[in-house]
């Protein structure tokens, strides 16, 4: 199994368990400070009340950890087992969704002598569907950060197909690996939501 580390996530409340998809090889991203986390939350939920973010902490049980590891194909580090959930609402108090930040690489990639980061923010609504998605501060092909690619992942649920080249998902031609990693991140976000806050039959 692959090892993974560091979690900081935000999830929603309603979800139904889906059929297994190909293992995501993503690991969860952790922003260094609340200021950075808040900045990136607001980029994802631009209509959120900046002063009304709520944080909910969760601890996965041993059974949930085993289920997640089986579905994802890698082991969770201790810090991954106690995620934080960031809940967004607008200025009138309406629920907007939740946010999760995932770094979908298990091995570093070098570009121009520096590490090429790939950090994905995913927003999920109360119906358990992706409704926001953003790639942060990416130094590779910027098509990966644009709506023409990212909007294909909107409205997909855990039982959707996240494989690039199938079910209407078209990757960025110059970055096939990164395109799939972004798709994997969206699927993992929904799975983590399901286990943490949903009902599993």
Q: Language-model segments: which ranges?
A:
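Intrinsically disordered terminal and processing segments
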Residues: 2, 8, 16-119, 125-201
């Amino acid at each position: 199994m692959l090892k993974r580390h560091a979690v900081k996530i935000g999830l929603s409340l309603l979800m139904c368990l889906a059929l297994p998809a190909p293992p995501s090889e993503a690991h969860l991203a952790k922003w260094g400070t609340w200021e950075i986390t808040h900045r990136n939350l607001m980029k994802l939920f631009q209509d959120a009340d900046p002063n009304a973010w709520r944080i909910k902490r969760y601890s996965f049980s041993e059974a949930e950890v085993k289920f997640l590891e089986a579905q994802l194909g890698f082991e969770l580090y201790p810090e991954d087992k106690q995620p934080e959930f960031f809940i967004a609402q607008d200025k009138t108090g309406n629920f907007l969704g939740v946010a999760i930040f995932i770094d979908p690489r298990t091995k570093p990639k070098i570009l121009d002598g520096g590490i090429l980061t790939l950090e994905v923010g995913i927003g999920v609504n109360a119906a358990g569907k992706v409704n926001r998605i953003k790639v942060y501060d990416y130094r590779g092909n910027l098509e990966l950060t644009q709506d023409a690619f990212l909007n294909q992942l909107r409205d997909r649920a855990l039982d959707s197909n996240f494989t690039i080249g199938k079910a209407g998902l078209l990757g960025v031609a110059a970055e096939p690996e990164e395109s799939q990693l972004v798709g994997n991140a969206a699927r993992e976000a929904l799975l983590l939501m399901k286990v943490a806050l949903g009902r599993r039959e």
